């Protein structure tokens, strides 16, 4: 089965072709980071317009890279939610228009299920079951994954997502957009232990997260720097140490909760997915914990940590292989800007 995947939930337009026999044939991605940088964040209307401009050229690129023909495509998978309503509507409309023109079925995919399954695209994919740590700009969750469509929420953030905390911390420190990579880069130049920030809910006894207090602690430190009238090199060093303190605190919590989830489920495999899953400090800490405690940790390729069409094509192929009745052949569709991943559980 050859499936075309279309991702448009936020500020990346991604298309890909995935074959159930041959794997990922090709994928192409356009990021809108440069367009949104002057605004300090994603502007939904601009994002939607750009998806319209980019989708069809990316489709031609993917078809050319793969060597496949349009008539070879068996189905079209698209991100149905969660995400920005307008952006989702663009991707869904394009998917269903192509499907109608080509006489192909469609299937709507949960964006987070795509991330959840993205590590299956590597050369040696992890077998089921496993614990998944989903960490992105909008979501932070721990899930028990027994099979495709068999998900149990073990814990989730009670306020800010980890990626959101990274972005807000970057803004507080005065870094550019996108904030997550910038604060991580600055943290690598900071002195470990120079600034120690709280580890929210580290000892809460459950698997939930909270990052709003950590963000507030960063704001408090910045006010202290201002009161001390730091400037020049002294302020630059203080900001680097603060960034290091923030990243260390966030990573400590993510690692500790992941270890607790493995202990609770008695599983020996951890999958990490989502944009924050590309963070080098997080990967290093989890890999060190895995070596020490004897469990396996799996990540998607760095290029597939961000939103992408490959994960949507994969999820669509896996769903249609298991549940052919999910194929939509009447081309009526809805999008779901808010959509609980646990609601997919079968």
From Swiss-Prot:
GO terms for molecular function: iron ion binding; N(6)-L-threonylcarbamoyladenine synthase activity. One of its GO terms (biological process) is tRNA threonylcarbamoyladenosine modification. InterPro entries: ATPase_NBD (IPR043129), Gcp-like_dom (IPR000905), KAE1/TsaD (IPR017861), TsaD (IPR022450). Substrate binds at residues 134-138, 167, 180, 279. CDD domains: ASKHA_NBD_TsaD_bac. The keyword Iron-sulfur does not apply. One of its GO terms (cellular component) is cytoplasm. Binds 1 Fe(2+) ion per subunit. It holds the Pfam family TsaD. Belongs to the KAE1 / TsaD family. This is tRNA N6-adenosine threonylcarbamoyltransferase. It comes from Burkholderia multivorans (strain ATCC 17616 / 249). The lineage of its organism: Bacteria, Pseudomonadati, Pseudomonadota, Betaproteobacteria, Burkholderiales.
């Amino acid at each position: 089965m050859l499936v075309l995947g279309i991702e448009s939930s936020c500020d990346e337009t991604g298309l890909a072709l995935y074959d159930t026999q041959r794997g990922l044939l090709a994928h192409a991605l356009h990021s809108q980071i440069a367009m949104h940088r002057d605004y300090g964040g994603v502007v939904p209307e601009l994002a939607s317009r750009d998806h319209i401009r980019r989708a069809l050229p990316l489709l031609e690129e993917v078809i050319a890279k793969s060597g496949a023909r349009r008539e070879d495509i068996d189905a079209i998978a698209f991100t149905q939610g969660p995400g920005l309503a307008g952006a989702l509507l663009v991707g869904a409309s394009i998917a269903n228009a192509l499907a109608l023109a080509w006489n192909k079925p469609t299937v709507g995919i949960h964006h987070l299920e795509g991330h959840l399954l993205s590590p299956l695209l590597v050369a040696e994919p992890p077998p089921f079951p496993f614990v998944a740590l989903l960490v992105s700009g909008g979501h932070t969750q721990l899930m028990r994954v027994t099979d495709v469509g068999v998900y149990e929420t073990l814990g989730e953030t009670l306020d800010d997502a980890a990626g959101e905390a990274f972005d807000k911390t970057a803004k507080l420190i005065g870094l550019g957009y996108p904030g997550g990579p910038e604060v991580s880069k600055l943290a690598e130049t900071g002195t470990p232990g120079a600034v120690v920030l709280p580890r929210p809910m580290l000892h809460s006894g459950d698997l939930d997260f909270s990052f709003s207090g950590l963000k507030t602690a960063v704001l408090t430190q910045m006010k202290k720097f201002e009161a001390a009238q730091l400037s020049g090199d002294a302020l630059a060093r203080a900001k680097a140490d603060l960034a290091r303190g923030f990243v260390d605190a966030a990573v400590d919590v993510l690692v500790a909760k992941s270890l607790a989830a493995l202990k609770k489920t008695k599983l020996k495999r951890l999958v990490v997915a989502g944009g924050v899953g590309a963070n080098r400090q997080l990967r290093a800490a989890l890999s060190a914990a895995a070596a020490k405690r004897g469990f396996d940790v799996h990540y998607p390729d760095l290029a597939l940590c961000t939103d992408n069409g490959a994960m949507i094509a994969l999820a669509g192929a896996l769903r249609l292989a298991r549940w052919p009745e999910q194929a939509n052949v009447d081309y009526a569709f809805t999008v779901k800007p808010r959509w609980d991943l646990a609601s997919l559980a079968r």
